[in-house]
Amino acid sequence: MIFPDGSEREIPRAGPASIREQVRLVFLAAATGADILVSEMMSIGAECLAAESRRILQPGTLALTNVRLDHLDEMGRCKDDIARSLASAFPERADIFIPKEEIYPAFEEAAARTASRLHPVAPLPTVVEPGPGPPLSFGEFEPNVRLALAVLASLGVERETAMRGMAHASPDFGSLRAWRGRFGDPPRPAVCVSAFAANDPESSAAALLKIGREFPSHRRDAGGNSPHVSRWWVGLLNLREDRGDRTLQWIRAAGEGFFRDFARVVLLGRPAPAALRKIRKSPPPGGTSFSFYDGASPEALMNRAVSAAPGERVVIGLGNIVGPGERLVRFWDEKGTPHDP
């Protein structure tokens, strides 16, 4: 939680995350005299989304970032179904902001049904620049920036003020971040990038586009070819035992060539051995080497990740941040130096 004075506090949890946390948040916002409450809805499934948004928060402004194939068992197996699940969160007579390219018929139908105003946010005509002061964080994506600017403009916040606030904001633990450092035994130079929280292959592909512009792979530079680049991508794909549908997505993505720009990919988590067997049954295109690691030491894993590759290594975390992903991010944060583009 972030308070009006800029201070932060962890949300206390006695058990798993619950939408009931939003009830406490509303009471806390009222008790502190906040003028505006900004809350992230993380519900999965149409019924929970409807309860969280329409019964508890009842927002006057709702921002929806994208429609992605994730949590398929609860949200739906195709994007139209997922859009219908997300549309269940539309409150009555609210302003709904969505990137223009993410508009689905279900959103238009829900807006009409709830008497809400749908605002498709078109891509910005020019590159987003924060103006005077520090640049935006490496982890900021253009659709999210334009969405935030549109919402803030509707609330009377000037663009320069909004950009300055975003540029000075501390990145979330799970945001796209990069560190430089020396890892392994003997120490070797490496860039470590956390894209763990992107979760699904489509969101991760968007993150890889940003990563590729900053740290081109030895197999491809920003122009598509890189025979002279000695920078090797090594993927650390963290798989969760309770996200079987997501693991299957990653297995399919591997078979379709998702990792063709990677020299090596190391699978992590309990599903890793079974997932590796599936992947090896139909070797993915590109000649990428796949293996798994079942230890718990970030240091030992990094030693393995940066070994046996010439040039600079770019170690990219994908899949999920829970468990091994979180341990790696904390290790990189402790041992590395944050990369500022």
Residue ranges of model-derived segments:
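ATP-dependent carboxylate-amine ligase catalytic core
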Residues: 1-62, 66, 70-83, 105
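Adenine nucleotide phosphate-binding catalytic loops in nucleotide-utilizing enzymes
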Residues: 11, 72-83, 87-90, 94-202
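Hydrophobic "anchor" residues on beta-strands that sit immediately upstream
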Residues: 36, 61, 95, 191, ...
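Active-site flanking residues adjacent to catalytic metal/cofactor-binding acidic residues
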Residues: 39, 64, 98-99, 194, ...
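Conserved beta-strand/loop subsegment of P-loop NTPase cores
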Residues: 61-66, 93-99, 263
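ATP-dependent carboxylate-amine ligase
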Residues: 154-157, 164, 169-341
